[in-house]
Regions:
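N-terminal Rossmann-like FAD-binding beta1-loop-alpha1 element of flavoenzymes
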Residues: 2-29
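Flavin-dependent oxidoreductases
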Residues: 15, 175-180, 186-264, 268-279, ...
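Glycine-rich FAD pyrophosphate-binding loop
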Residues: 22-43
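Dinucleotide-binding Rossmann-like beta1-alpha1 core, especially the glycine-rich loop
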Residues: 46-126, 250-251
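Short beta-strand to alpha-helix junction loop
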Residues: 55, 62-65, 90-99, 138-157, ...
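Helical element adjacent to the flavin cofactor pocket in flavoenzyme catalytic cores
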Residues: 138-195
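C-terminal catalytic lobe of FAD-dependent flavoproteins
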Residues: 248, 257-258, 274-398, 405-418, ...
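Iron-sulfur (Fe-S) cluster-binding segments and ferredoxin-like electron-carrier domains
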Residues: 274, 406-417, 440-458
């Protein structure tokens, strides 16, 4: 019997787990993917929003400002990358200035510090590449950027070392309400828990509807992005927004925490909750709308990849974080779209309070609050590099040339708490395969290391999910029950 089961190991589920483990209780996280950060958390803008867009008085507004406030201290405690680069919301016409002013006033009501309304000239002094058509801008100095993978993994690792269990490849397929608990049916057996926290992203409505007569509907809203090489990383220093619409914050241009340039996302409501495909139409929209914000975008040849992500949109445009009225002990954390990444640490605390009111627990005296992340050789000083190599020669063996990732870093990613078992798991922890060649050079070597360290045949190594094998031929036929003659 568990005290709490959390369904979903994205940034929200991991944040909830980390906060719950401050107390003496038995917690398990069930995740249908093979790693943390496999859903919405793996494909978003990586923005730490200031909090001026959310409706004053809403849960989204409260958690946005609080999440932004604590992100910097959390990044130091859990050793993930974060930077306050500031953000600008652009206005292109005189008749739009009133909307910009309303956005400013919302931010003031929400308690966002340092907001300023700028003229077009003042905005261009901050960002010289802005379009000459910009007539005004809202500047938010508290806006920031973060690695969504790094944040999620840090929260999950810290929850794990404090006692939380993580069970991957474990999809929830049903639930029964017992007298004082829930029986959660999964593809890997049944689990019983007094409290269930539903942090399942775009599938949160499906889980809610298993236990409640009052049905929930979430829409999968797809966003497509283009990612530029680090050559273009200095094109802007701040996150550049256009005025938000009913579908979201619009097409942005932003540096990433690792030095790339990111543009996107689109906003398209789709039926397929696994619809992570990009389209020519969508990417054309990204380029066309992003081009409005600047004089000229960097050349297309500097784009190294494109991708799409899904966020869970709820019709009332606010987060749903509450105990379900007709399913006591079942807590929804649903409709977590932008600014969900920013809010995640605050959501973790908010849900922990709900759980503590429901089932009080004793605070741990030995809670581990500090984590040491993977040391990056690319960003280390010469002295630090020499020290790492002297302790382990694997740090002298460069595996990924684009990002200068060494074997030592990959080994750390595999053997640390909640170690990587997939190629994407290595990529998200070390950036091996994230560079210009997109793993063209390092893929075989990374597969060999994973195979060696996990003592698995190289043919069984997957990119991310079940069945995403790279290798075929004889080994694939053998794995699927065929024979050598069938090649």
């Amino acid at each position: 019997m568990y005290d709490v089961i959390i369904i979903g190991a994205g940034v929200v589920g991991s944040a909830v787990a980390n906060e719950l483990m401050r107390y003496d209780r038995k917690v398990a996280v069930l995740e249908k993917g093979l790693d943390v950060c496999e859903g919405t958390s793996k494909a978003n803008s990586g923005i730490v929003h200031a909090g001026f867009d959310a409706t004053p008085g809403s849960l989204k507004a409260k958690l946005n400002v609080e999440g932004n406030r604590i992100m910097e201290s959390l990044s130091k405690e859990l050793d993930f990358s974060f930077r306050r680069n500031g953000s600008l919301v652009l206005c292109f016409r005189e008749d739009e200035k009133e909307r910009l002013k309303l956005l400013y006033e919302k931010g003031i009501k929400n308690g966002v510090p340092g907001l300023q309304l700028l003229s077009g000239e003042e905005a261009r002094r901050l960002e010289p590449n802005l379009s000459k058509t910009v007539v005004a801008a809202l500047y938010a100095p508290t806006g920031g950027i973060v690695c969504p993978f790094g944040l999620t993994i840090a929260l999950a690792e810290n929850a794990y070392v404090n006692g939380a269990e993580f069970h991957f490849g474990t999809e929830v397929i049903g639930m029964d309400k017992l007298l004082d608990s829930y029986l959660v049916h999964t593809t890997k057996g049944d689990w019983e828990s007094r409290i269930v926290v539903n942090a399942a992203g775009v599938y949160a409505d499906k889980l809610h509807n298993m236990v409640s007569k009052k049905k929930m509907t979430l829409v999968a809203r797809k966003g497509e992005y283009c990612l530029y090489d680090k050559q273009a990383g200095g094109f802007v220093s701040k996150t550049i927004f256009q005025l938000p619409t009913e579908y979201g914050k619009g097409i942005l241009i932003t540096p990433t925490i690792h030095g790339n340039l990111l543009i996107g996302p689109t906003a398209e409501d789709i039926q397929d909750k696994e619809g992570l495909y990009t389209t020519g139409r969508g990417l054309e929209e990204v380029m066309k709308k992003a081009a409005l914000s600047v004089d000229m975008l960097p050349p297309l040849r500097q784009i190294i990849t494109s991708f799409a992500g899904l966020r869970a949109h709820e019709a009332k445009d606010d987060f749903i974080i509450e105990e379900v009225e007709d399913a006591k002990g079942f807590i929804d954390v649903a409709g977590i779209e932008s600014p969900g990444l920013t809010c995640a640490p605050a959501i973790g605390s908010f849900v922990a309070e709900l759980v503590n009111k429901k089932a009080p627990a004793i605070k741990k005296e030995n809670y581990i609050s500090r984590r040491i992340g993977i040391k990056s050789m690319a960003s280390a000083s010469l002295e630090e590099q020499k020290n790492l190599i002297s302790k382990d020669p694997a740090y002298a063996n460069v595996i990924c040339r684009c990002e200068m990732v060494t074997e030592g870093e990959i080994l750390d990613a595999i053997h640390r708490p909640l170690g990587a078992r997939t190629l994407d798991g290595i990529k998200r922890r070390t950036r091996a395969g994230s560079g210009r060649c997109q793993a063209g050079f390092c893929l075989p070597k990374t597969m060999e290391i994973l195979s060696r360290e996990w003592k698995e045949d190289v043919s069984s190594i997957v990119k991310s999910g079940e069945g995403s094998y790279y290798l075929g031929g004889y080994n694939k036929q053998k794995r699927e029950g065929g024979s050598k003659d069938e090649i």
